[in-house]
């Protein structure tokens, strides 16, 4: 059975979700990456859209005009770690509950998710066209002067995913934990290989 989060998301909706879980999103998803984060955190410019209880997507979409509406063509995830220095404050200031992106994030985001009850989730890379099919409608767009990839595209989505939980509200970080685990497994293997190839200069 699918675990589907629907916006507006509340803290209690997230308490039983853990790293490694696969979830889906229905409701509001707003594309929001580097420049929007900088505007809010560094320049202290308020966002033109209320993200409280909503979800953001680290993504630079391709959209096209269809009559008087915008249509999503492709929307693939951007590397989330680019937003690491801003994300904790961003979560605190906006009340956003779901941060969607590519790859993991670090200790600042981990702290923000635990303290302010949010999740970071990973959307599979290479599936930008699939993601676009899960966007039912682009409802609004803001900060268009930043260009298509950096604008805030307010999308209505249905069962958007799959989304793999990488940071949960309990302070667990799937990618960081996996790095430690893989390093522990790697070291004895490397030592064994070195014993067999020590003669190679």
Curated annotation (Swiss-Prot):
GO terms for molecular function: L(+)-tartrate dehydratase activity. InterPro entries: Fe-S_hydro-lyase_TtdB-typ_cat (IPR004647), Fe-S_hydroAse_TtdB_cat_sf (IPR036660). Disulfide bonds: none annotated. Its EC number is 4.2.1.32. It comes from the Bacteria. The active site is at residue 37. Keywords: Lyase. Gene3D superfamilies: Fe-S hydro-lyase, tartrate dehydratase beta-type, catalytic domain (3.20.130.10). It catalyses: (2R,3R)-tartrate = oxaloacetate + H2O. Induction: Induced by tartrate, via TtdR. It holds the Pfam family Fumerase_C. Belongs to the class-I fumarase family. Heterotetramer of two alpha and two beta subunits. This is L(+)-tartrate dehydratase subunit beta. The gene is ttdB.
């Amino acid at each position: 059975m699918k675990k589907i989060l629907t916006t507006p998301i509340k803290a209690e909706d997230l308490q039983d979700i853990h790293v490694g879980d696969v979830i889906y999103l229905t409701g509001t998803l707003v594309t929001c990456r580097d420049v929007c984060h900088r505007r809010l955190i560094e320049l202290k410019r308020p966002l033109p859209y209320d993200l409280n209880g909503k979800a953001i997507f680290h993504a630079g979409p391709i959209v096209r005009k269809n009559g008087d509406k915008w249509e999503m063509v492709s929307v693939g995830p951007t590397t989330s770690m680019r937003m690491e220095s801003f994300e904790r404050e961003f979560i605190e200031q906006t009340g956003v509950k779901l941060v969607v992106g590519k790859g993991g994030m670090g200790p600042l985001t981990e702290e923000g998710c635990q303290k302010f009850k949010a999740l970071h989730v990973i959307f599979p890379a290479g599936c930008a066209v699939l993601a676009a099919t899960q966007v039912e409608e682009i409802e609004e767009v803001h900060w268009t002067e930043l260009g298509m990839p950096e604008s805030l595209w307010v999308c209505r989505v249905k069962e958007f995913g799959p989304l793999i939980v990488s940071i949960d509200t309990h302070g667990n970080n799937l990618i960081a934990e996996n790095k430690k685990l893989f390093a522990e497994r790697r070291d004895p293997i490397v030592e064994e290989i070195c014993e067999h190839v020590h003669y190679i200069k």
